[in-house]
């Protein structure tokens, strides 16, 4: 049975993290299932190139390392393990400000995060296992086939596999709403996605707020 929403994430993207917390906030208020899927900023930007921006490339490499561990988590424990790992990754990277640890010492960082998620320690070693790249690349390509290639993360697909399946990039929000505000945004975004709107955008945004 298909989930009600597919959420495509790269763990190093702060905007995807905030959007994911909004999604989990609404999940507590509405009865729906989320399938946590992979999209790699490293793979997206490999085609575009980094033009000498080594900092971004290092961060995106770290994101791919995290996705490999998430793939190993899924292989062992399914979607629930991916959800637990992504929560632990986001809390460490974004809320805890530990992104540089992931970049500079990925194995030690991921061992710590896997432990926080309550998952088997051995999956942390998957960070350098490129055999996981096949599924990560496949899911990245699926996500981009639904939205077009000129986007990043997150990508959301409402009602996957259904006749009214609808995908979009975003929403990009600076702070995750809660309660009624979270539900209002959910209904608005789903309506826009299902209506066939291609783009609504402004480039001005506030800094991400993780509290």
Where are these regions (language model features)?
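Residue-level signal for beta-strand positions within conserved beta-sheet cores that form or flank
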Residues: 1, 30-32, 164
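Structural alpha/beta surface segment adjacent to cysteine/selenocysteine redox centers
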Residues: 17-106, 110, 188-192, 196-204
């Amino acid at each position: 049975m298909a989930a009600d929403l597919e959420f495509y994430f790269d763990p190093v993207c702060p905007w995807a993290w905030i959007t994911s917390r909004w999604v989990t906030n609404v999940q507590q208020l509405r009865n729906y299932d989320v399938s946590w899927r992979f999209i790699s900023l490293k793979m997206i930007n490999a085609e575009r190139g980094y033009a000498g921006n080594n900092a971004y490339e290092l961060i995106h490499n770290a994101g791919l390392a995290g996705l490999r561990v998430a793939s190993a988590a899924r292989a062992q424990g399914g979607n629930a393990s991916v959800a637990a790992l992504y929560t632990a990754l986001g809390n460490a990277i974004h809320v805890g400000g530990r992104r540089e640890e992931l970049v500079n010492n990925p194995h030690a960082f991921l061992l710590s995060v896997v432990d926080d998620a309550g998952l088997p320690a051995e999956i942390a070693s998957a960070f350098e296992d490129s055999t996981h790249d096949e599924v990560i690349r496949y899911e990245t390509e699926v996500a981009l086939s639904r939205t077009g290639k000129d986007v990043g993360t997150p990508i959301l697909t409402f009602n996957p596999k259904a006749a009214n399946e609808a995908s979009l990039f975003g929403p990009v929000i600076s702070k995750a709403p809660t309660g009624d505000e979270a539900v209002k945004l959910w209904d608005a975004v789903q309506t826009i996605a299902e209506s066939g709107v291609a783009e609504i955008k402004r480039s001005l945004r506030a800094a991400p707020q993780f509290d």
